[in-house]
A protein has these predicted regions:
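Glycine-rich phosphate-binding loop signature in dinucleotide/nucleotide-binding domains
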Residues: 65-70, 112-113, 200
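Catalytic His-Asp segment of secreted/periplasmic serine-dependent ester chemistry enzymes
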Residues: 123-203
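Charged helix-capping and loop-helix junction motifs
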Residues: 91-103, 141-146
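Cell-envelope and extracellular/periplasmic
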Residues: 6-11, 36, 44-51, 72-93, ...
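Serine-esterase "nucleophile elbow" of acetyl-processing enzymes
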Residues: 1-48, 53, 61-69, 74, ...
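Active-site segments of SGNH/GDSL-like serine hydrolases
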Residues: 77-83, 106-143
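Generic structural signal for well-ordered alpha-helices
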Residues: 59, 102-106, 146, 150
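Conserved beta-strand segments of alpha/beta enzyme cores
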Residues: 41-43, 117, 157-159
Length: 203
């Protein structure tokens, strides 16, 4: 059976109800596993992959206990943490640094999982009106980070899974809070992710 490895933040991993700003989200990983049961083994980073530099720091540790050389597809996202404004500050990762970090994460993926095809997922939109002021994201900035990610992936010849456009069509019932998705939203994301991963396997 083929092996798929998912890298991503709490949109993938899920987010428990730990604060007034987060009402609990299952994450899409479990539904990708459900969708591809019997077709592919779906593995994932054992924690929230957060921002690109965090992924770069911990990816080697995350892949120590998996058959890394046998991974066939890596579906990867970083971006929402990078574009996050905390406590009225600038985005966590300056956009030029974000581009550099994406290239470095890609190189690390290629080194650790050399036989895998890589797919990059664009970051999803937020409900701006519900964003807490201490942890704020602007969709226009998410779009700009996605634009830069697309440029980097074009340079690296990595296909892009446009989850931003998909989720732009979601109403509030698809969201668990201002950023994370409900089961309905996670299942919708998982459907497209499973489809894109299977296309990569068959390419």
């Amino acid at each position: 059976m083929k092996n798929i490895y998912l890298i991503g933040d709490s949109i993938r991993f899920g987010a428990p109800n730990l604060s007034p700003y987060n009402f609990g989200s299952p994450g899409y990983e479990r539904y990708v596993k459900e969708k591809l049961a019997g077709v592919a083994n779906v593995l994932g980073a054992p924690e929230n992959s957060r921002f690109a530099q965090f992924t770069l720091r911990f990816l080697t540790s995350w892949t120590k206990n998996i058959p890394a050389s046998q991974i066939d597809v890596v579906h990867w996202n970083n971006g929402l943490w990078d574009a996050l404004r905390m406590f009225d500050d600038d985005p966590l990762t300056p956009i030029d640094v974000y581009a550099l970090m994406l290239k470095r994460v890609y190189r690390r993926i290629r080194r650790l999982m050399p036989n895998a095809k890589v797919v990059f997922a664009l970051s999803t939109p937020v409900i701006e009106a519900k964003q807490p002021k201490e942890f704020y994201r602007y969709n226009r900035e998410i779009e700009e980070y996605n634009r830069v990610a697309c440029e980097v992936m074009k340079e690296l010849n990595v296909p892009v899974n446009d989850l931003y456009t998909l989720a732009s069509g979601f109403d509030d019932s698809y969201y668990a809070d201002a950023t994370h998705f409900s089961e309905k939203g996670c299942r919708a994301l998982a459907d497209q992710i499973a489809k894109v991963c299977m296309e990569a396997l068959e390419a």
